[in-house]
């Protein structure tokens, strides 16, 4: 009898754990899918769709620039990037986690992009990113914080450049 009770308890416990894990996996997959769709929107240079993935109170922390804390400032960052004729971008999530509450998650991954530098020369870049997402009341995920930086070494000023100022 004790064996039956133990087996039943273990079976129910494992079943409950599987249900919990399946829910988390489903939420993580939904977040991964949202991030992948966002990457496709940016790759197709669709400004409106790209910016639509941000929450109303989002903050973007681009490298070597001030934080963008308004929708207009975020739109300007993307507008400037997408306007470059040589601009190509893609990113892929390598880690996705959703809080137990189910309404907050983060994505980290890698990106590749090409765009023109100040002289018009195409520059290839690759790096990593982190996004913090919020699940809204309508069930859609929106990015509340977005930051990225390059894996490439920072370029050094030309010798004597500081002295010429």
Question: Where in this protein do the model-derived segments appear?
Answer:
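A solvent-exposed, acidic/Ser-Thr-rich amphipathic alpha-helical stretch
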Residues: 28-32, 47-102, 108-110, 115, ...
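Glycine-rich beta-strand-turn "strand-cap" elements at beta-sheet edges
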Residues: 92-101, 147-152, 160-164
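Short, acidic, Ser/Thr-enriched surface-loop or helix-capping motifs
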Residues: 55, 117, 136-138
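Short beta-strand edge/turn micro-motifs at domain boundaries
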Residues: 126-154
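A short acidic/glycine-rich loop-to-helix N-cap element
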Residues: 118-123, 153-159
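Short, low-complexity N-terminal intrinsically disordered segments enriched in polar/charged residues
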Residues: 4, 8-12, 18-56, 155-165
């Amino acid at each position: 009898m004790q064996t039956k009770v133990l087996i039943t308890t273990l079976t129910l416990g494992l079943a409950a754990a599987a249900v919990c894990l399946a829910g988390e996996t489903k939420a993580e997959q939904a977040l991964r899918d949202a991030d992948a769709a966002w990457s496709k929107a940016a790759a197709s240079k669709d400004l409106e769709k790209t910016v639509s993935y941000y929450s109303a109170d989002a903050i973007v922390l681009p490298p070597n620039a001030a934080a963008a804390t308004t929708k207009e400032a975020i739109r300007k960052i993307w507008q400037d990037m997408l306007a470059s004729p040589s601009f190509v971008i893609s990113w892929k999530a390598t880690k996705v986690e959703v809080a137990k509450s189910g309404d907050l998650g983060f994505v980290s991954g890698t990106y590749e992009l090409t765009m023109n530098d100040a002289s018009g020369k195409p520059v290839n870049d690759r790096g990593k990113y982190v996004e913090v997402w919020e699940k809204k009341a309508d069930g859609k995920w929106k990015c509340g914080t977005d930051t990225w930086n390059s894996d490439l070494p920072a370029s050094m000023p030309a010798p004597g450049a500081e002295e010429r100022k």
